[in-house]
Structures are given as structure tokens and as C-alpha cells.
Amino acid sequence: MAPSVQAEVDEGANHTNGFPEFNASRRRQPPPKLKKPVPHYRHLVRWNKYSIPESIEEQQLNQDLLICRQLLNLFFNANMAEAESILAKGQIPVTENQVDLHAFDGLQGTASTNLLQKTLDALGLTLEDIKDDSDDLPSETSSSAASSKDGKKSPSTTPSIAPSTHGKKNKVKKEKEVKSMYYGLGGAIIQGLRALVTFDPEEIEKGVEAFEQAAKAADKLRKGTIIGLGSVKAVGSFVVGTIGAGSFRGMNRVQKHAELIYAESTILRSLLSVLYHVDVWMVFEECINLRHAFTIIQGLKSYMDSVESELRAGKNIDHHQIDEHLVSGVTLSYSLYNIIISFMPDIIVKMLQFIGFPSDRDWGMAMLAACGDWDPMAPPETPAQHAERLASSANDGIRRQFCDMVPIIFQVIVSSFIPMNHVDLNYAQMINDYNLELYPNSPIFLFFKGRHLQVTSKFDDAVSTYKSAQAKIQPRWHNINHIFVFEELMIAMTRSDHETACENSRQLLKESRWSKCCFRYLTVITGYERGVKSERKKIDTLMGKVESGMQTVAGMNLFFETFCARKSKRYLKEGHLLLPSYDFMLLWNTFDMMPLDVLGEALAKISTEVSRLQGLLPQKMKDRENQPLAPKDQTMEAFSGGYLSSIFSNKNALIKDSKVEGYENFYDDYCLAFFLQGVVAYHLAFFPEAAFDREKCELALKSFDTVFRYAPLIKDDTYTYYFTHYYKAKIWIHQGRLDDAQARFKYLLGLSNTNLLGLPALVGGKGKNSLEIMVLFKVHSGLLEIETARAAASGYASSIMSSK
């Protein structure tokens, strides 16, 4: 072992050299300490859904809310097509007395067929009524633009999401004007979901138009005469503009809902529009719209804060007529602003904070938990408590399930890609189990269940759950299957099950248009790893089409497509790829999900390639390996007085000595192999809830040092250099060397420009990092992890001092 590696491991204060004897659990981490109290708006609900108000408008709102809530139940419980058909029939006038509102009681959790029939009975409809309408609805499978088996592009497949006729909306049938703001929003959300699962430019444009119609329907019911409210769109409100709580006190219940719907429709339209437009200036315009919508959401929150203050003061708040739908809507929107902005780099966060946006992720998550009355640290509920939760009207808010979905998504999906603090998989499972009890046939919550099993390394159970969920998806929503197929593909690649992986990737290439570039590449590498010689010509042909499948979102290329395109160029130039499946897994963090036995198999395969490449290393380069590395910091600056100076002074000699005949990108593969070996060894060393493996930690450090040594010779795959820095900093965090880890993260942030002048490909490379955005997100989360670790250490030290 190299002396520098031994020094890395030997540094420490206790008998484990700073490392814990046992690794922490990935299922549950301590909850965060919040900087401010969390409001509990669910206690403000003072509305009886069965009382008949005097206003016809409010009567209509009550009926629309109850119907849309029930349609949402149908949608979640696998009756997606039927819910869409009922919604498409349009608003039922309350004056016709057609709807039996009491018939909706207790329908959650019933069998799917009974739920549908009882809903139809309550609405005065028959199954034939909605079947007739379903014939006029768009079929999702018809717009999936399936490719032929050899990967040829169909006529509707374009390399960009936006069609070539951008701006000509006459090709898309204009959405009919909607009269009900909730029907309009519901229809727009369904159309937006269809746009996302198909990625069809026409469907995306229809979704944008649908949200515009929903906003118009809500705008007609807004109280625009209130001073400050009508000026939300003014440019002057962009920086510091807000709507005070007093503006909402003068509104009736319908007008408050109109404000909420208007803001939500604006937000969702802007986000969907970003996918559609390729113009960066259009993205800037949508950011302004998001700011305008936020002023409304912030005003509603201020209003509810003032009502909560009245409640704490013992005042009667019945006259405010706050219902669970308004509570769940304000909670969801304001929390998402906090959570999403918090993931952005510090410089962007500070800019957004300057113009009034919040960015407290932990507080946003806690606000969502309060909406559902969830407590991550609470003991399991008693049967009586559970029954009370199911019966509570506060859980009937039309956005209630979305408030539950956000923490589940961040716990079991986002945390797999971006390291997060305070991950609690038990908490996510508790929320998801509750919703599965309400919606046992829901493909959405079954997906979350499967994903939870997947991230906890229970691959067989995860695949079984994914298969079960796919069986419940209706033909009209066939493209949702692709989400499950992709997860099964990742599991198959993790297990080196090349047959299944090849089958799944071909299905995605044939049926899905999410990313033709990515799916072509996956089809190629799974076929390549399967090793069937008769398919080699098809593989070569399809690899030549990878780059042409790239698309743009908000005027920018997607990082994973850039990665696939660069790898395809390498393959076409050299005729081979090194460990392409493991290389691709880095993009989706599947190493974090691998069980110990699979990690062991991966290490054996990667180590075999490492040994093979070591045999190809020129002898003169092996002689150079005796030169000592920098004793501590392995950054390029640390080399400036040693190794790099010898490179610059003997550049021609170094190029000659390092050359491997017939292997132009040898050092790209050499560093990649050692990097992958280090990553797998890292995960073995710090496998959750297992004993710390010192030997694997030493192997990881040794592998990373090898990457640092040969990084100046990398020509294309410079991402290995940056990720190596990241994983070395992660080891230091485990060891308690927080200052060193922080310095390494800040060093990486200093390299986050796209040109990377002089770093690290100093000899002949381009110096670009195709996975830069991933590095930035990981480093940002790593800095937050260091802050949390310091706070925990400070709290522990304080408790020790107080006990003395």
C-alpha cells in the first residue's frame, strides 16, 4: 500500500482511526432542528362540506370540490381513464340537483369497481355515458411515436422536444373554454401528466394551453379590485412585491380558491412551458411568472398565519371559512418553493432569496408533514389512532395526497441521486402504507413501494411490486409502464442480468420517446455486454444514431444525453467500451442500492479489468509510479511543485513514454477502472448497518490516488477526476475530518465552469466535464452534510459539558 494511503487511514483520534466501528443506518437519520416554528394549518379548518351556503357560486364550488376529490380517488385507484372521461364531460350545474353529495362518504379504500360504480351513481351517470365520451379522448399509445426494432426514427420523432413549427399553434386544436376552475385545473393536470409520460411536443403544447384555460377560469372569479392584488403582474412587484394578509380578509371563500387556482395554474404552465420552449429568454419570462405566482401563494400563507394567530389568542375563526382544500393547496405550493430552491447552488439561492423566495428545505418538509399530521419520530399508531386518521375530514383536502407524495419522492427517489440529510425511509414507508390502504390499486403508490424496496436492496420484492403495478395500468395510460420498465432495467444492469436488461432497453427504445439518445445507448451497451457476436453489426449501427437522438430542454442539452453521446463517439472511434453498465450506473447512483453480494461481484469484475489495464501500462510509466504523491491534498494545485512541473518541462517525453499502441484513450479507461474500483470499495467499506471494512477503505483510497496521478492524461472522461474528489471527501466525512472535506468540496465548486481552463486534461484533452451538474448537486449536499455533522458534534459536546 502506498505510504500516502496508509497515512490517510491512520489519521484519527480513536482506536478506529476516526472511522465508526459500525456504519450508520440508511433507513433512519435524526430529524433536523428547525430554525422556525411550523404552522399547523389543518387546525384552521372550520367548514362543513354539507352545509348549504346562500351563494350559488359557493354551492357550485362545494359540489365541484367534492366531485373532483372523488375523481382524484378514482385516478389514484387505477380508474384513470374513467376519471378523465367524467372530467371531460364538464361541470354539472348545481341548480340541476343531479349530484348526491352524501353518496361520496366513505368511498376511499373500496374496491376499484365498486368505487367507480358508486361514483357514477352519485353523479347520476352510467358506465355507458363515460364510455361514449372516452372515444373522443386522445389515446396515449397513439402518440408514443414508437420506433422500429432497429432504432430507426419514426416520422414524429425529433431530436428536440419543441417541434420545428415552434410558435404556430394552429396545428394544435385549441382547448375549449372551461367554466369551472377546478375542472379546468384537473383537466390540465391530466393533460400535463400525459405530456410528461409521452414527451410529445403536441401533447406538451396542449398541456400549456390547458393550464392557460384553467388560469383564465380562475381569473374571472378573482377579486381584482383589491389594491395590490391587481398589480401582482406589475414589474415593480418582481423584487419585493407581496400581497398582504389583509387583502384576503376581504375575500369570500370562492375568491380565495380562485387566487390559489390562478397561482397553481400559472406555476404548472410555466414549468411545462420550460420543457416546450427552446428559447432561453422564454425561460427567463417563465421565471418572472413563477415570481408573480409566488406573491399570491405567499399572501395566502400570510393570511393563514394571521388566522392561526387569532386561534392561538382564543378568538373565533369560523367566519374565515377555511376548508381543507385551501389548507392543502397553500401548504403544498409554499413548501415546494422552499424545497426545490434549496437544492440549487448557493449563489443562485442567494439571488432568489434577494427577490423574496424562501429556501428552507427542512422547514418545507416539516410543513408538509404537519398537513398530514405526520411525526417521523412518533411510535406506531394504535388501531384507534389509525381509524381516527382515516376518518378525519382534514385528510380530504384535494391536494392532500400530493402533500404526502412529496416527502416520499424525496426520500426514496431524489435522495438516491442527490445525497440528502435526514433521510428516513421508515417515515416514507409509513406515509406510503397509509395511502396504499386508501388506494390499494394505485400504480403511483405501488411504484413508491417498489422504489422503497429497491433502495433498501430488496430487488426481488421490488421487481414483483413493479410487475403488480404494471398490471393495473389501463391501456390509455400505457406509457406509465415505462417508468417501471426503466427501474427493472436498472435492477437487471445492477445484477449483470444482461438478457433482461437487453429486453427492457429494447422495449423502451421501441415504445418511449423520453430520451431516444439514452435508450439507444442503453440498448447498445446491454447488447454489447450480452456478447452475442451476430448482433455486433446492429450494435455498431445503432451506436451511430445515439447522438442524433439528443434533445434540448430550456435551450440546454440534458447531461445524461451528453454523457451517452460522448461515449458513443468513443465506441465508434475505438470499437469498445470499458465496463459500460457500471459506468452508466454512476448517473443513477445504483451503487448505493446494491446489496453486499452484488457489490462483491461488481468489485471482482472491475478488479479483473484493473489488472488487465495494469498489464498494458508502459514500463516507463510504471517507473514513474515510484514518485511520491503530495502527502495530503491530491488536488492539481498540490501537484504544481512536483508532478505537474515535470509534465510541463518534459511534455514531449511524457507523451512518448505514456503512449499505448492502438489505444488512444488508454488513460481515460485506466482512470475509469480505478475510479469504479474505488467507488465499489467505498460502498463496501461503509455499507449501512454493517461493520466498517478497513481493508476496503484502504483499497478505495489507493484507487482514488491512482486516478489523481493519471488525471492529467485523461482526454475525454474528465468526470472521473471530479467524482474521485467527491468520494474522497465523503471518506473524510466518515472519518470526522470535516475541515478537509469542506476544503475539497469548495475546490470542486471552483472548477464548476464549463471551460475548466487548464484542468485537468493538461496534456491533450478538452477539459470538459459532461456530468458537471451532478457534481455540483452532490457537492452542495455534501456541504450541508458537513454543517449537520458539525451541529451534531457541537450538540454532543455541549451535552457532555453540561453533564459535567
Give the ranges of each region predicted by the language model.
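Structural register within alpha-helical repeat arrays
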Residues: 70, 101, 187, 194, ...
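Eukaryotic alpha-helical solenoid repeat scaffolds
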Residues: 400, 525, 529-714, 718-725, ...
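Short coil/linker segments at helix-helix boundaries
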Residues: 60-63, 77-82, 104-141, 145-434, ...
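N-terminal alpha-helical scaffolding segments that mark the starts
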Residues: 2, 8-96, 100-105, 178, ...
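Generic helix N-cap/helix-start motif at coil->alpha-helix transitions
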Residues: 61-66, 400-402, 439-446, 477-485, ...
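Fungal intrinsically disordered, low-complexity serine/threonine- and proline-rich regulatory regions
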Residues: 1-37, 134-166, 798-804
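Boundary/linker segments of alpha-helical solenoid repeat arrays
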Residues: 95-103, 218-226, 230, 308-310, ...
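Solenoid-like repeat scaffolds
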Residues: 54-57, 88-95, 171, 353-358, ...
